[in-house]
Amino acid sequence: FCDAEIMDAEDPLFILYTSGSTGKPKGMVHTCGGYMVYTSFTFKNVFQYDDGDIYWCTADIGWITGHSYILYGPLSNGATTIMFEGIPSFPNYSRFWQIVEKFGVNQFYTAPTAIRALAKQGSSFLKNCDLSSLKVLGTVGEPINEEAWQWYNKYVGRNNCPIVDTWWQTETGGILISSIPKVIPDKPTFATKPFIGIQPILLDEKGDELKEFNTVGKLCIQYPWPSIARTIWGDHKRYINTYFSAFENKYFTGDGAFRDEDGNFRITGRVDDVIIVSGHNLGTAPIEDAINEHELVAESAIVGFPHEIKGNALYGFITLKQEHENLDDIKKEINILISKKIGPIAKLDKIQMTNGLPKTRSGKIMRRILRKIASK
């Protein structure tokens, strides 16, 4: 073994590249002191870790969730943390639940993409698995839609496990907004409240703060926190321009958010996922949520494409839970559902049924590829 090396708190701990699916990758630099303090503290509190618990995050350690909440956060608490290589469908769709039963997992943390894929197969694959050891369920990587949340709660949590819908980013290092079991109650599709010391604010296009409730704005963080990335490796100017130039001295997350009357935050998606149709700003996340409420839909993705009259039109890529012959009827039903939930302006001009959506290793939809397909 090697003797431990004494490090300065601000010495680089690791460099992790992000956003390669949407543009030139950025090498985010995280440091020894602040990063490990914050991941340790958030892990223990958000997941309500107790000594002796068995914790499992299904992420790949090659992305930030794996770094923060498979390795550094759990291990700094002396936790038993499970590492998994594989997919939830092999050798069958009981794989996750067999592992939970085998090791007596207490905290389970996964992505909405995985939940939707498993929900698509129904609940039969859970019936013969003992999930009684579970105490806390978590989601990470993207907002979770209502249908997936309810399935997760009912069939995995047995209506008895709090669900922490965690919001954070590679750049933040650790969880910034989340419910906390026994402290801050969960709420379907909401990340809920900021973690201790985090001060999120909503801004309008001019940079003015939106202080009222039941409002939508651009999500920024008012003040620094211990695990914020310190720079982009070899390009500090790009770091400043990317995260701090839009709204002076505030960290701009790039996400939009809705704040309800109780101060709970719901992430509405990337602000660059807003499509202007006939002068109306339409966010893709609410439209996708509406589509996903259809009983036959497994998941969906919306992108814009040029339209000579509207400026932009909406193109929907939709995956069904199983094959159906009457696709035209389903497409009509989807647009009727969108009209009821959002309005006629949000109806899809084109709908393409697909067996799956292109995704990064972390489960995020690669909209850049979908835009290229839609524009042809």
Predicted regions and their residues:
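Gly/Ser/Thr-rich phosphate-binding loop
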Residues: 76-79, 106-110, 119-188, 199
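AMP-binding/adenylate-forming catalytic core of the ANL superfamily
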Residues: 101, 108, 225, 230-234, ...
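Conserved AMP-binding/adenylation subdomain of ANL enzymes
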Residues: 36-54, 64-107, 120-123
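Conserved S/T- and glycine-rich ATP-binding loop of Class I adenylate-forming
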Residues: 12, 18-21, 43, 55, ...
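Conserved pre-ATP/AMP-binding loop-to-beta segment of ANL
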Residues: 1-17, 24, 48-54
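Active-site glycine-centered loops adjacent to acidic/histidine catalytic or metal-binding residues
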Residues: 60, 141, 168, 192, ...
